[in-house]
Amino acid sequence: MTNIRKTHPLMKIMNSSFIDLPAPSNISSWWNFGSLLGACLAIQIITGLFLAMHYTADTTTAFSSVTHICRDVNHGWIIRYIHANGASMFFLCLFIHVGRGMYYGSFTMLETWNIGIILLFTVMATAFMGYVLPWGQMSFWGATVITNLLSAIPYIGTVLVEWIWGGFSVDKATLTRFFAFHFILPFIIAALVMVHLLFLHETGSNNPLGISSDSDKIPFHPYYTMKDLLGLLFFLILHLTLVLFSPDLLGDPDNYTPANPLSTPPHIKPEWYFLFAYAILRSIPNKLGGVMALVLSILILTFIPMLQTTKQRSMLFRPLSQILFWILTADLFILTWIGAQQVEYPFITIGQMASILYFSIILIIMPTVSLMENKMLKW
């Protein structure tokens, strides 16, 4: 009798994706972050659903409803903090996942890479809109500042901003539509994840060596299901430690003050995972230039496959490229730090230098160094 998982129309798809999937035998723990992102998405959708049952998307009651969730709803406080810190864990896994793709040359799988970039933009949009919902000071002013950037678009900018706001300022209409989008986008993300996996399974996974693994495959289950479960265990330990011991560590104290359009916080800044892009935005004195740099800071990932000059796919045996990769990582840490600082000397200068370095490494230095490595290896 044939196994049901190989014949049933639905189970057949699951089987070929997660059980009998031929996987390279040498993929390391850096490949765990894909499954962790799936776990993050599931956690966010489930906790978000329970929060939406008690939340009210109205400017007069939004802040109170979040307080009500934390004080009066059974286990509401932990659901709220799992959701809020889940976003931070989501982005931590996302950044590592993208970094791994750059390091080991996974960007050569063009469809998978480009869908991944679309996913990154969608997750960023979802997180931004979610940050507005508690209707605290930083929620309100963050929404005002970031949406106002669209007014830099020539000719249609002002109309576009007022259209997004649903009026002449961030108000009830804005909050209602942001809640609607914040609710629907995770399901769109889930659909995009399916497309991401579809394209990934067309080519098969990359591996640390960056060479074809067709001659040495192992079934996904039990080897990588166990490995992913171990990764998930470590992830949950870190996540729950954050939730139970320091739930407000990554948040902003200003968001515990109800939104007040008449009082501007001394320093408007987004959540930590947007700070690097925010620092790049602020490092350019011109508004339109800043917005373009902000978009390019993520969109630049689409250029990486076109800028690849190396004959080796992975950076595993390319020490110069490795050094550059870690300089780029350090540069992103510096940009994140600068994004959280006041707009004053010396932070302005440091931010500008770090922004120039960020674009230079990706667009100029890395392709040049890769050509040098080809010469050194006589390729």
Curated annotation (Swiss-Prot):
Q: Which organism is it from?
A: Cheirogaleus medius
The similarity comment for this entry is: Belongs to the cytochrome b family.
Q: Which residues bind heme b b566?
A: H97, H196
Q: Which InterPro entries match?
A: Cyt_b/b6_C (IPR005798), Cyt_b/b6_C_sf (IPR036150), Cyt_b/b6_N (IPR005797), Cytb/b6-like_sf (IPR027387), Cytochrome_b (IPR030689), Cytochrome_b_C_euk/bac (IPR048260), Cytochrome_b_N_euk/bac (IPR048259), Di-haem_cyt_TM (IPR016174)
Q: Where in the cell is it found?
A: Mitochondrion inner membrane
Tell me the protein's name: Cytochrome b
Question: What is annotated about its quaternary structure and interactions?
Answer: The cytochrome bc1 complex contains 11 subunits: 3 respiratory subunits (MT-CYB, CYC1 and UQCRFS1), 2 core proteins (UQCRC1 and UQCRC2) and 6 low-molecular weight proteins (UQCRH/QCR6, UQCRB/QCR7, UQCRQ/QCR8, UQCR10/QCR9, UQCR11/QCR10 and a cleavage product of UQCRFS1). This cytochrome bc1 complex then forms a dimer.
Among the record's GO biological process terms, what is one?
mitochondrial electron transport, ubiquinol to cytochrome c
Query: Which keywords are on file for this protein?
Result: Electron transport, Heme, Iron, Membrane, Metal-binding, Mitochondrion, Mitochondrion inner membrane, Respiratory chain, Transmembrane, Transmembrane helix, Transport, Ubiquinone
Which residues are heme b b562-binding?
H83, H182
What else the UniProt entry mentions is:
Heme 1 (or BL or b562) is low-potential and absorbs at about 562 nm, and heme 2 (or BH or b566) is high-potential and absorbs at about 566 nm.
**One Gene Ontology cellular component annotation held by this UniProt entry:** respiratory chain complex III
Q: Name one GO molecular function term.
A: metal ion binding
Q: Where does the protein principally reside?
A: mitochondrion
Free-text cofactor note:
Binds 2 heme b groups non-covalently.
Membrane topology designation: Multi-pass membrane protein
Regions that span the bilayer: 33-53, 77-98, 113-133, 178-198, 226-246, 288-308, 320-340, 347-367
Which cofactors are required for activity? heme b
* Physiological role: Component of the ubiquinol-cytochrome c reductase complex (complex III or cytochrome b-c1 complex) that is part of the mitochondrial respiratory chain. The b-c1 complex mediates electron transfer from ubiquinol to cytochrome c. Contributes to the generation of a proton gradient across the mitochondrial membrane that is then used for ATP synthesis.
- Which sites bind a ubiquinone? H201
Q: List the disulfide bonds.
A: none
